Regions:
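Chalcogenol-based redox active-site neighborhoods
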Residues: 1-174
Length: 174
């Protein structure tokens, strides 16, 4: 995974905001915001990844003008549209189907339980100068303590974007 202080790579990927498809070019959206949160997951419906995304959506962070929030999955935009609806996500869910962007952020899983070249699970916070201010990665099925969104909220606060860390209810094993 990229480390704090490194420059975040630009990218352009297809995605959906709700059920509206479009292209998401990071450079077009990064300008004018104080911080960007990129949530990498292999699939929006992977058990603990789904819990993180649900909590991120419930937090309401995406409704803030100074903050950009995107989920980046290995799913198609069709599956992402369903996930956005099922999880009530208020931010774009973007398809990195071949894990090219995940590779540039060094969060690609080469071979994970029979799945090859998929985005791993991680969170990256980027400042307006494209500098990585927070980076975290773990196994897609791990239930971390504390939840990764606690550290994401702290990194946002350091950038002057005061947000509350959402409570994450992990349902792994259901």
């Amino acid at each position: 995974m990229l480390t704090v202080g490194q420059k975040a790579p630009d990218f352009s990927l297809p995605g959906v905001d709700g059920r509206d498809p479009g292209m998401y070019d990071l450079h077009r959206f990064l300008e004018g915001v104080d911080a960007t949160v990129l949530a990498f997951v292999p699939s929006a419906h992977a058990p603990v990844c789904e819990d993180d995304l649900r909590a991120l959506g419930a937090a309401g962070w995406a409704g803030r003008e100074e903050l950009l929030v995107w989920a980046i999955t290995g799913d198609s935009i069709f599956a992402n549209a369903d996930a956005a609806e099922d999880l009530n996500l208020d931010f774009p869910v973007i398809s990195d189907f071949h894990a090219g962007v995940a590779d540039s952020y060094d969060v690609r899983l080469e071979d994970w339980h029979g799945h090859r070249d998929i985005p791993g699970r991680g969170f990256v916070v980027v400042d307006p100068d494209w500098t990585v201010r927070h980076a975290w990665q773990t196994d897609p099925f791990e239930t971390p303590t504390p939840p990764p969104l606690d550290a994401v909220a702290a990194a946002l606060s350091d950038l002057g974007v005061a947000v509350d860390a959402p409570a994450v209810e992990y349902r792994a094993g259901d």
